[in-house]
Each structure stands twice: as C-alpha cells, then as structure tokens.
Amino acid sequence: MHSSALLCFLVFLAGVGASRHQSTLSEDNCTHFSVSLPHMLRELRAAFGKVKTFFQTKDELHSILLTRSLLEDFKGYLGCQALSEMIQFYLEEVMPQAENEDPDIKQHVNSLGEKLKTLRLRLRRCHRFLPCENKSKVVEQVKSTFSKLQEKGVYKAMGEFDIFINYIEAYMTMKMKI
C-alpha cells in the first residue's frame, strides 16, 4: 500500500516539475520573442517584396485602405484587438483572393501568409502581446471598405501590406517598452 502511494506521489511530482519546466520554456520563448521580432518582420518584408510590384501596379485607386486611424488603434487601448483582427483579415479574406490573382505569385503569397501565421502563433503564445477581446471599429471600417472595392480590394490590401508590417512593428515596439 505504501509503495503505490509513494509511486503516485512521485508521478505527481514529476508532473508538477514538467509543467513548471513547460511554463519556464513558454516564458523563455516570450523573453526571446523581442529579440526574434526584428528578424520576423524582415522576413515578412522580404516575402512581401516578391509580390509588392505585382499588387501595387494593379492598384489603380488613389485612396488609402490602411489609414493612420488604424495605426492609432494599434497604439491605443484596442491595439491588441486591432492587430489580431487585421492578421485574421489578411489571412482569411485578402490572401486567399490574392493567391488566385496569378499562378506565378500564388507560391509567394502563400509563403507570406505562412510567415504571418507564424507571427500570430508567437504573439498568441506570449499573452502580453495579444491579451484582448474587444472589437476595433477601425478594423471593421477597413473590412467594409475592402468589401466595397470588390475585385480591386485585393490589389489595394496587398499593395498596402508594407504599411501593415510597419503598423505591426509600431505596435510591437510599443508593447516591448511596457
């Protein structure tokens, strides 16, 4: 009887130790995240560079989709939600359409999407960067404008992806100072 109780206790201690180790790993990943962020942003910019000319030359509209209001939302109390919603918007609405624009760019748009998914995953693992639940009115406005632009919306949204990367960088820089 004593040996089975001892065995259960040892299994319990092993589990506690493993969970502490996992927690430490997660915290370490968040600590190193600020070091790896510039590299991830460079990778996003490089991936976007492969499709930038294609989308910007097809964008014939003289308006801005990603306005300064979005950057202000990123910097404000809704920054977390605005960033989360914009990443989701690009991954679920913009990039699937962008992939269908030309077979020659499909692979590059897909690669850009994978890099954005990796960034989102790392942000979610470090709750200090994405601890949010509220909706951003500016993001809803971006989505509404995108929809109204119909087939031209994908050129506009993809053509301005570099602005989006800059806004991500501004948000992350602000969060790292906190």
From Swiss-Prot:
UniProt GO molecular function: cytokine activity
Keywords from the UniProt entry: Cytokine, Disulfide bond, Glycoprotein, Secreted, Signal
Compartments, as annotated in UniProt: Secreted
InterPro entries tied to this protein: 4_helix_cytokine-like_core (IPR009079), IL-10 (IPR000098), IL-10/19/20/24/26 (IPR020443), IL-10_CS (IPR020423)
Main location: secreted
GO cellular component: extracellular space
Signal peptide: 1-18
Gene Ontology biological process terms in this record: immune response; interleukin-10-mediated signaling pathway; negative regulation of B cell proliferation; negative regulation of cytokine production involved in immune response; negative regulation of inflammatory response; negative regulation of interleukin-6 production; negative regulation of membrane protein ectodomain proteolysis; positive regulation of B cell apoptotic process
SS bonds (residue pairs): C30-C126, C80-C132
A Pfam family hit: IL10
Coiled-coil stretches noted in the UniProt entry, renumbered to this chain: none
Entry-listed glycosylation sites: N29, N134
Family: Belongs to the IL-10 family.
Description of how the protein assembles with itself and partners: Homodimer. Interacts with IL10RA and IL10RB.
Known function: Major immune regulatory cytokine that acts on many cells of the immune system where it has profound anti-inflammatory functions, limiting excessive tissue disruption caused by inflammation. Mechanistically, IL10 binds to its heterotetrameric receptor comprising IL10RA and IL10RB leading to JAK1 and STAT2-mediated phosphorylation of STAT3. In turn, STAT3 translocates to the nucleus where it drives expression of anti-inflammatory mediators.
Protein name: Interleukin-10
Organism: Felis catus
Upper classification of the organism: Eukaryota, Metazoa, Chordata, Craniata, Vertebrata
Chain's gene name: IL10
